[in-house]
Amino acid sequence: MSRYRGPRVRIIRRLGTLPGLTNKTSQLKSSSINQSISNKKISQYRIRLEEKQKLRFHYGITERQLLNYVRIARKAKGSTGEVLLQLLEMRSDNVIFRLGMAPTIPGARQLVNHRHILVNDCIVDIPSYRCKPQDFITIKNQRKSETMISKNIELYQKSKIPNHLTYSSLEKKGLVNQILDRESIGLKINELLVVEYYSRQA
């Protein structure tokens, strides 16, 4: 299944707020759930499916990519669900988004694809590149890159940067301090339901 490129508001009306997909919010989710519950009992499969879809649309990845991340998480030590979230959160496009250098993950992915971003002084043009503790993220030394990202930071770096990241406005540099903990996830999600959804595939 390819990456979704359709109307984003339609998705958040169905799944609720997804800050990685769009900075718009929807007030329709809770009422639609209540009406659905009153009409018929929601199946466990649908509940798991919706949690999986939240994860996929928030991080902007394909079905195949998400399944691969689940398989990697199953082989790692620790809670499969927590490891899965850590893998997704440490993607370069998500790190750039969480630093406030882009308004959304699709916006961050575009910065990476267009070679505006450096990790440890090397251009990274692969959005799925996995950042590691002590990696530092900087802007390509070109006026266009600096102007674009500085404007994004001014507009979108409003919320608190999560504890596993820091950003220096003076140096225009982001730093990955550590692997993030569960409390720092920027999405309301029940990752165990996602793991259960893939239990027969991963």
From Swiss-Prot:
Pfam families the UniProt entry points to: Ribosomal_S4, S4
Keywords associated with the record: Chloroplast, Plastid, Ribonucleoprotein, Ribosomal protein, RNA-binding, rRNA-binding
InterPro entries: Ribosomal_uS4, Ribosomal_uS4_bac-type, Ribosomal_uS4_N, S4_RNA-bd, S4_RNA-bd_sf
Main localization, broad class: plastid
PROSITE patterns in UniProt: S4
Stretches assigned to the S4 RNA-binding domain: 90-158
GO CC term, one of those recorded: small ribosomal subunit
The keyword RNA-binding belongs to this UniProt entry's keyword annotation: yes
Source organism superkingdom: Eukaryota
Annotated PANTHER family: 30S 40S RIBOSOMAL PROTEIN (PTHR11831), SMALL RIBOSOMAL SUBUNIT PROTEIN US4M (PTHR11831:SF4)
Complex and partners: Part of the 30S ribosomal subunit. Contacts protein S5. The interaction surface between S4 and S5 is involved in control of translational fidelity.
Protein family per UniProt: Belongs to the universal ribosomal protein uS4 family.
Function (record text): One of the primary rRNA binding proteins, it binds directly to 16S rRNA where it nucleates assembly of the body of the 30S subunit.
Protein name: Small ribosomal subunit protein uS4c
Species annotation: Exsertotheca crispa (Moss)
Lineage: Eukaryota, Viridiplantae, Streptophyta, Embryophyta, Bryophyta
Protein's gene: rps4
